[in-house]
Amino acid sequence: MTMKLNYKRVLLVGMAFFLISAFWQAYDAITPLILTNHFGLPQSVSGTIMSFDNILAVFMLPVFGALSDRVNTRYGKRTPFIFFGTIAAVIAFVCLTFIDNYQLSLLAAEGIPSLTAGTMSEEAFSLFVRETTLALTLKNPLPLIGFIATLLLVLISMATFRSPAVALMPDVTVKPLRSKANAIINLTGTAGGIIVLVLGMVFATSKKQYMHYTGYVLAVCGVMLFGFVLFLLTVREKKWAAEMEADTEKYGLGSSSDSKAADGGVKLSRPEMRSLLLILASVALWYVGYNSITSKYSVYATNILGFDFNFTLIIAQAAAIVSYIPVGIVASKIGRKKTILSGIVILASAFTAGFFVTPDTPELIMYPVFALAGIGWATINVNSFPMVVELARHGDTGKYTGYYYTASMSAQIVAPILSGFLYDSLGMRYVFFTFGALFVALSFLTMFFVKHGNSEVIEKKSALEQLDVD
């Protein structure tokens, strides 16, 4: 009897990741622009504030992942966290824009949006405006304080349900099918990101330096609530988790007795622990490289290249969407480790190519660069999380999800702070892609020595069975 992935079920579970990805796409796009353009903060300070979500995540994601392992309600273990966290995040996100609007009114009262370059160079004028804006912020810091306080509420709300949302896929999917399932999860997440990027083009978020973002954020929250409602109406967490346990027993893949691992009854062997640590180190390294690009690309494209960052990122997301399912299939044939190593090479090559794109280069040259980056990131991302939870026993999936996010979020604390400092010290033009490519390349070394985390290869009897889904 052949194991079959229920694509529809995984797609519906992925609605939680859909709304999470929609939020982060908007957050990463507009928050650095608000901090640098509306408050006049230097890149190093902006990068530090942008790392707040990762600092919170290092502590909160493992806690809420492990907590959701132990919760048992009529709606399941993960759904209650998704319910309350989403509602709180949406409300706080909208409130954030009201504070930004107040700051913009203060800038308008001082005539800052009406300033023109005159005989000044574009670079000198940009520096003059930023310093003038920063002086106004320091004179009246209350809007910035209120903005950061509300931002923390948004980030705390998101952190309460990210691990539970991601842990839900392994809860309802047997181990050998998790790379394919994770491809679908990433597909839904990328779809959420692309929708938000299209909204960014509609609202022209890359064109207006002193834009009011309330309308844009309301539209983004509408996308989030669409995924949220669809998730609540269709996902039956307890029923589907019970069916997964039955399938696990039926195919001899382990048993629910593995749940004693959550209480320390079963520990990883020394080689397994070594592989886990190497996987987590790899995750940290490639996230430092990747996040240094994604968290500041809106600033780099707008201020250095003069490009529309929204469409470039859509190209990357579209390439990733095309790649997710084939990558999951490839991993089931040649193994997750080999697939990830190839993805690292692709991503590092893309970032290296990006270094050679200058303000004088036609914008369309950046499109294949980011398409390649999207393919590389999809190849890595589809397989890295399943490698971590492959080492988990049934009862501690949430805890291992927390380990994964501790590694990735710790890296994303370092990335914006370190890269921001280097941008301020050495200039963004020459450091931006170099920094990203270097750290992605380093992850190849740690991943090369991983020995555990691959799934059993699934072989189907015929070509027709390769298309067999529920």
Cite the ranges covered by each PLM segment:
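Helix-to-loop junctions at the C-terminal end of transmembrane segments
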Residues: 59-75, 323-336, 423
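Cytoplasmic membrane-interface "Motif A"-like loop-to-helix N-cap segments
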Residues: 70-86, 107, 333-344
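C-terminal ends and interior cores of transmembrane alpha-helices
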Residues: 83-140, 346-360
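C-terminal transmembrane helical hairpin of 12-TM major facilitator-type secondary transporters
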Residues: 338-381
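Intracellular juxtamembrane helix-capping segments at the cytosolic ends
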Residues: 160-173, 379-393
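A membrane-interface helix-boundary motif in multi-pass transporters
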Residues: 77-79, 204-222, 421-439
